[in-house]
């Protein structure tokens, strides 16, 4: 009765023995016991693999960002892992070879802080939490490939983080340097630039970051700046907001470095600018706080040093006791420390041209810098281009195009070797040194004779020592362990000391997706065959908060691992993640007083009629709103308690139905009951069908279970076939997973109506129920499996995916096609195989890239060929 994808010789798991295994009654139940159903099926699946094994199918690598083992999964974890589990179940039903692993991002400050506070080892604390969280995933009914499990604090894993560091060192991409670094005074460790927010606070502790001069280890991510920026264009399945954040962070600008000679000094001051033509209107030079000239003068000028230390003065400028010569006009220019100039931009020095830049204008006004209110650019060059002619007023330059003026000035300065064309990047090298214990040891030793020497690969891993307690912050605890520090120089065999800083934990998480594919490999981080056949990750799911840190570092590592021959990802431009899903947050109901918006504990609130008031003061009104969950807001949800109350199936369905994947989920426990009522309705439909079958004679049953060609039966058959097509599209689109449930509710109502009016053939009703149960099985595994068994099947509900007889073309694999606009390929799209040219054009116009490139343009002509879409616009 149910037409399904064939098993192609794959072995379908039999579950006939489950009838004896399950403990509850199979008679009609108006109220199914969801908790009992879930527990029995989860227990059964511990020893019975629920899916069809298909090692020869097309691969589908589905990965959710692995968690820090804090000891407790929160509702945000439940949401992201539910999404990845649903997709993995769907693609397994489609016959794919699915990779759906899980591991632990286990190094980091929380474990070390907990160890200090509780007087225990960081290792014991971490592994105990991993044990707890694995048990919690069981309650959530998430099916991970636990045979691929990794933990970054395991020496078998961090050995390969050290190996990759050494490969970077040998390639000149890992180096040690003196640097002014970001210092977190609370966690007492260095932070990378990416770990300091726009307000100058630490990403983890929230403390105001200080500056220190330390010798630190860096990874030369800047060497990959162009690749990291340009290859964002090849990621059509990444959210635009994430790509925009990475573009801005990399911050490539093309401009010029111009040298300004210092008066009464042989040195020059190098300035970066994208508008060299404004040099004639420059009134001052502005320097960043950590520019070498500012730091040099602060050593000689106590007032300047105090100015830089005093946070209340940092928004004010300070004039240095030196001047620069304008290389075009010859004018002497005052030099200032200016707070709006960033260390990370260009050379940390900019030209101050108040009539061309608002920030320059405001700074000049605050610091009483004299400048002309109108442009006096009238200077231009002789035909020989060697000397400056007389000054003219600006009207004489009105006919000179800006580009021509820029070219004249640049040519003049280049001839005098005072200017050069450069690309500037906001992205700086990645500082990875951390003054903490619980991290990957940096595999270097320091020798008085040889300097910094790499540990031989044969001696990896450099293991962390066993410590029962960690006592100190501020300097690496490893620096206090003399027996661990003392070693022999691998080069001269003389006495040496180990590097006592550990690596930023983002190093470990920048390549873990490779290790999942070959987690038992003792020779390499990942075998070339495994990486090249199973990478990239097809669907990567995690929070948008990782847009810059983790995702940028992972792209860097992925490209580097290709460069050292660990994978062949040229086809994908060595990008690790094909599709990125940034799921929305979960917000909880928050109670605040109307008068002063004080956050309340729900226990302080009472409901009177339709309004809420303080229990302690019934006249004080309370307002309700949904806000980000946190302990301080008393609006969190214990996912395990909730699952134990309602059952994992109901919670999974509620999470998916309540909001689109990228939308904010407003957690409302009252709405969970609606999901429960829907599943109960399916349960009753199944039992009504079974009851009707039970009353039939054998001959009647044989006839009635055959789908017949009458109007009502054909209508229901058309509805369930359309439902298959819709579900397939929703699962593969991912962002519309919530519509699987809403469409399933509609089909449930149609089936219930068919059972009531008694005008639909019972065989058609059974087929529609089988389709319904199969299509919701990725979301609602235990309940669907139970219904499938009740419908008389002894194979797994996951044995195959049904095919729609209405629109078989919808089940075909989508194709990736480049879109060319006015002769240039602008983007690529993944789309279903469509034959009608208008449908194809409409599909292109509805994509994000289509809207970006075509929203304000009229398509004059379109040419659709087999492998390219070509558009001509006005």
Swiss-Prot record:
The keyword Transit peptide is assigned to this record: yes
GO BP annotations, alphabetical order: Group I intron splicing; leucyl-tRNA aminoacylation; mitochondrial translation
Compartments where found: Mitochondrion matrix
InterPro entries: aa-tRNA-synth_I_CS, aa-tRNA-synth_Ia, Leu-tRNA-ligase, Leu_tRNA-synth_edit, M/V/L/I-tRNA-synth_anticd-bd, Methionyl/Leucyl_tRNA_Synth, Rossmann-like_a/b/a_fold, tRNAsynth_Ia_anticodon-bd
Gene Ontology CC entries for this record: mitochondrial matrix; mitochondrion
Segments carrying motif 'KMSKS' region: 628-632
Catalytic activity: tRNA(Leu) + L-leucine + ATP = L-leucyl-tRNA(Leu) + AMP + diphosphate
Residues annotated as binding ATP: 631
CDD domains on file: LeuRS_core
UniProt GO MF annotations: aminoacyl-tRNA deacylase activity; ATP binding; leucine-tRNA ligase activity; mRNA binding
Transit peptide, from-to: 1-21
Motif 'HIGH' region, chain ranges: 67-77
Pfam families in the record: Anticodon_1 (PF08264), tRNA-synt_1 (PF00133), tRNA-synt_1_2 (PF13603), tRNA-synt_1g (PF09334)
Top-level division of the source organism's lineage: Eukaryota
Keywords: Aminoacyl-tRNA synthetase, ATP-binding, Ligase, Mitochondrion, Nucleotide-binding, Protein biosynthesis, Transit peptide
Enzyme Commission code: 6.1.1.4
NCBIfam families in UniProt: leuS_bact
PANTHER family the UniProt entry points to: LEUCINE--TRNA LIGASE, MITOCHONDRIAL, LEUCYL-TRNA SYNTHETASE
UniProt similarity note: Belongs to the class-I aminoacyl-tRNA synthetase family.
UniProt protein name: Putative leucine--tRNA ligase, mitochondrial
